[in-house]
Amino acid sequence: MARKRAAGGEPRGRELRSQKSKAKSKARREEEEEDAFEDEKPPKKSLLSKVSQGKRKRGCSHPGGSADGPAKKKVAKVTVKSENLKVIKDEALSDGDDLRDFPSDLKKAHHLKRGATMNEDSNEEEEESENDWEEVEELSEPVLGDVRESTAFSRSLLPVKPVEIEIETPEQAKTRERSEKIKLEFETYLRRAMKRFNKGVHEDTHKVHLLCLLANGFYRNNICSQPDLHAIGLSIIPARFTRVLPRDVDTYYLSNLVKWFIGTFTVNAELSASEQDNLQTTLERRFAIYSARDDEELVHIFLLILRALQLLTRLVLSLQPIPLKSATAKGKKPSKERLTADPGGSSETSSQVLENHTKPKTSKGTKQEETFAKGTCRPSAKGKRNKGGRKKRSKPSSSEEDEGPGDKQEKATQRRPHGRERRVASRVSYKEESGSDEAGSGSDFELSSGEASDPSDEDSEPGPPKQRKAPAPQRTKAGSKSASRTHRGSHRKDPSLPAASSSSSSSKRGKKMCSDGEKAEKRSIAGIDQWLEVFCEQEEKWVCVDCVHGVVGQPLTCYKYATKPMTYVVGIDSDGWVRDVTQRYDPVWMTVTRKCRVDAEWWAETLRPYQSPFMDREKKEDLEFQAKHMDQPLPTAIGLYKNHPLYALKRHLLKYEAIYPETAAILGYCRGEAVYSRDCVHTLHSRDTWLKKARVVRLGEVPYKMVKGFSNRARKARLAEPQLREENDLGLFGYWQTEEYQPPVAVDGKVPRNEFGNVYLFLPSMMPIGCVQLNLPNLHRVARKLDIDCVQAITGFDFHGGYSHPVTDGYIVCEEFKDVLLTAWENEQAVIERKEKEKKEKRALGNWKLLAKGLLIRERLKRRYGPKSEAAAPHTDAGGGLSSDEEEGTSSQAEAARILAASWPQNREDEEKQKLKGGPKKTKREKKAAASHLFPFEQL
């Protein structure tokens, strides 16, 4: 127990000794400090770093020293650290540093001193006696536990300025949370709205680009239908091909024609192409020299020859619009696919990388790994970079902790910045060894000679480049599979080629180090996106013809040389009819391609005006596509069955879908799940939904499936009974459980109604027997006057305002009252029109009366208040013969005088003066009679 207390330090309560023992320990410490300072120089620097302290702790005592040497040296080190701590404290206080940071440094220094004491005591445990342990305890006690010093220092650390503490009340917390929630919801709404808008713009751009490409195809097909070009093409065809009738054309005939065409016409990329000449002029020139500038012109020439032979031919175009999904949406998935490329330029898939990561590793004691770790820094750094980032935070193993400083320094040199690693990785070429089986699971790394001697590379060594081999892992199945996949992914390169050519080609193609870059490179390489189709009447089918590669009747070959992805393939015949033939050429049409295309309804609506009138031929082609799809094997991945046009899994069924019958045939299994035909998947509906389709559920039928309803009525029922919230309350029925709706019969002039007092007329077949529908406005008013039964017709429901509202269309009446209601309604409309006419006439007369009254008032006001203005008018005409400016001045003055003369107060003053001069006075009765026809404001 004594040793443990000495090594780790006793509690603070037991550190306090008697005054006598403290005095003795202080005296002994002062003597030993003097001896220590005589042997060692006082330190001039601040606290040493943790690394230097660790090295000094591992240092041994001087050889040949006495037995007390280690103890003295230990005392000296502890004393030096305490002195350094005091110096740091004084400097911090003198410089005015923040005192809140100093206790942490003091605490770290205390931990360092205690750690040093523990290490020294544990190393010298077997050599020192009990007294030595007590001396160490007494020496470290004053340094760690001086009560007076610590109390004074803690008082000095008290803050001088007042401290403000803010306490949030529950009401404030609720308000803050509510505002944060509202802000977050608004940001989410705004973000979704922006994404929705951007998605709509990108989709519209995709559609516009697709239509532009289709219009370009129409233009090219129209040029290839010109009779002049047909005549030129017919003139160069040998006679053995012109003697065959179009109905006798077969695949053998087309193969011979393609062979002759390839032998006659050549492709010369050096031919000139003038922008001023149109396509027709260019093709005429190409016929003259029996040559084409590119594959597109070659296809156009062969199309002219086939149409000159009166063969039904299509120009097939693989349209390449911008992708339907933007690049940002595709780039959401992280960089699992951004991996190192192999010699052929192909990248490892994520599954291969996972297999490589899970390979068992050999022990560290093997010679190969020692050579790889010590002699080659760049491959090891490259290997570390290729591994997952989650290993960076893992704790170091015990073997790494036991390594010496040399190994740590070597590891430190391997840690480079990311930019440095990329530059090194770009100079590394990967070479496969196909000859030896022992090194088949590994790979060789080498640098090109021109880049290995780069003077800017600090880690490079002079001399020829050395081959650096990676450690060969154990021969496991995963390793052999990954190696074989990597070998097959290198563009099917022949392993027998010379090493020099393979290394040079790999160094050129190794610049693309990620799979995304390779995809962009493959997409940039344009393929052959146009070929032909000829209808063989003997076989009654369309045969594809690739005149560039000399292939007839091989759709997969056309797909092989076309630009990927193949999304839209259309065929345009000589009459301009268009047919979507993507299903014939794309092998992944049912799984991948359909998801990359625009909405099927929009695309079908776009091509509907150009649909061929030969429906029998179109139906046979559809059956051919269906037979081709049925011959393909079942998909092996579960995700491919979702929305598959032929197959379905139970896990992918929607809420209102079910498989019927329950004993449906199982076509196969995918990972233990039964695969059913898509024809067995039926859509179920509730009773109300079937009624909208003019069908009702038969009596006694049990719901085929129960789901949770979300109508307002179902929600209210669940809220009323909490125990039924999780139960399925909506029964669904299949088509086989329903029958046609039988409309009721009208009896005694009464229209049959539903429980809401209306008539459901979702389809014309739901009309009650003996009734008719009249689409006349306000017919129910006329029927109410005549006491005839009239009911509104409900033709559907419209959801707005949070609820479903019925949509009405006309009225349902009995057939015997039809003529009476029509006559009464017409009479009612005549009366309404007459009343409207009278109302308009009355309003017009009132307006004319008001206008006449206004004119009379105007004349009366002129007579009463306008004598002076008329008298002043002749004075304005006296100034004749003036210039235009003078005339304008006089006219403005005259107008001002006229207005002043006609002002009401001045006229009233004149009238008062005339009254004062003389004349008979009017009585009040006369004045009242004279002012009876005036308005109130005129009587003032």
From Swiss-Prot:
Give positions of region: Interaction with RAD23B. Answer: 496-734
Polar residues composition bias: which ranges?
A: 346-355
Compositionally biased tracts (Acidic residues): 121-136
Q: What is the effect of changing N754A?
A: Reduces DNA repair activity; abolishes single-stranded DNA binding; reduces binding to homoduplex DNA; reduces localization at DNA damaged foci
Description of post-translational modifications? Ubiquitinated upon UV irradiation; the ubiquitination requires the UV-DDB complex, appears to be reversible and does not serve as a signal for degradation. Ubiquitinated by RNF11 via 'Lys-63'-linked ubiquitination. Ubiquitination by RNF111 is polysumoylation-dependent and promotes nucleotide excision repair.
Q: Where is this region: Minimal sensor domain involved in damage recognition?
A: 607-766
Q: List residues, modification Phosphoserine.
A: S94, S129, S140, S397, S398, S399, S453, S460, S883, S884, S891, S903
Q: Where is this region: Interaction with ERCC2 and GTF2H1?
A: 816-940
Q: Where in the cell is it found?
A: Nucleus; Chromosome; Cytoplasm
Q: What protein name is recorded for this chain?
A: DNA repair protein complementing XP-C cells
Name the source organism. Homo sapiens
Taxonomic lineage from the root: Eukaryota, Metazoa, Chordata, Craniata, Vertebrata
